Amino acid sequence: MSTSPKKPKTKSAAYKKVDIVNVHLWGKHIGAVALDPTWGFYVFEYTPAFASLGIEPAPMQMPVLPGATYMFTDLPEATFKRLPAMLADTLPDDFGNALIDRYMAQKGLDKASVTALDRLAYMGNRAMGALEYKPTRSPPKQKPSAIVLSDLVTQARKAVEGTLDDDDHARAALRSILDVGTSAGGARAKAVIAWNPSTQEIRAGQLEAQDGFEHWLLKFDGMGSDNELGSRSDDGRIEYAYYLMAKDAGVSMSACRLLEENGRAHFMTQRFDRGPGNTRHHMQTLCAMNHLDYKKKGTNSYEQLFATLDRLALPYEQKEEAYRRMVFNVVGKNCDDHTKNISLRLRQGQRWELAPAYDISFAHNPKGEWTHQHLMSINGRFKDFTRSDLLQLANRFGIGTASAVIDQVVSSIAQWPTFAAQAGVKNDLADDIAGFHLLTLGRWGAGALAASPGRVRWRHTSR
């Protein structure tokens, strides 16, 4: 009996380290970034050709000036990776970085030897927003094919738990999750997908979407527990209920929906950094735009947000929109209101604008490190706000409709049971969340805001 010879295992190609990364925006080479060996930080310079176009991708901290170089030795490394903030902003956070580390390990690089330039090169043209990086060190493109969501959930959970093995099947699983999971920010496991609303088919969405497909972001349900987040089984439904409630309150958001499979409810939101025909929009979080480190607790304020909007000369309507979101976060107890959860958008040929709201959900843990109080202050307070606090901020920044905005938001959040029922949130959980809503902000009760006593359940759903 003859046997076929075993197919030899193929070694992955050796990884080539990156010394300089060229940055592109809308097909134009805008500059390059490299390590300054003296300081140990990364320095960026715009190209002379780009400097003549009048486009400002980072107007507050890196204005486009011929011959100017930018290096920021005062920015905390944990957040900005020794990079200029505009570039660091395009790197993924915990989940995406863990996947990149796993991929690099297969290439023979341990985590300590992977530089910020390596990570930018890995992102290539996969990053959120419109910036692209060359050379590219990411896996080669694959032909778009359908993804089985339940399999992807399993792979994401293994990636979160660090239990992906090194056999051939594990490598294939890693490749699948890499195709969807290394672009989006935030600690929670997310997938960047292309979704066909007619056929319900899902494909990897980091590159161009095919005809009939749209760019969406999916937050995985069923990922287990987290020290800060606690039980995670209802996060998708809660966030969807908050989306319905925010829309009713007049908050501007991209389309959202639930994708249900095998008893799980995954929250989906349409990407606002993509437009028709795979158009890409340039993005900056508030964290990057104004160097407001989102990891610094007890430091940042909503006043800094409105000062940023004023410096960018945004119109009144967008300042009112930002105010509406602030009030919604306070009344709805979304304490995960850090500077990476607010973004500005630049569409090609247009001016900077406030991006749609995102990561709007119930997020409060009285014993949590991050969400026992708000992460941005109002009138010097991080909790126990009064209507007067909100109105004083409004007066300072010329929000003349503030009182009406507050009352509209309170009226919508008072209808929480209706929105929770529409999203399928369990009654007892919906009741617990309602106990934390700060409805005393309404015109009929403008006293100090405090959570209802006796509530012991907590949730934190957006980090």
Residue spans of the language-model regions?
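Phosphate/dinucleotide-binding and metal-coordinating scaffold of catalytic cores
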Residues: 1-339, 343-463
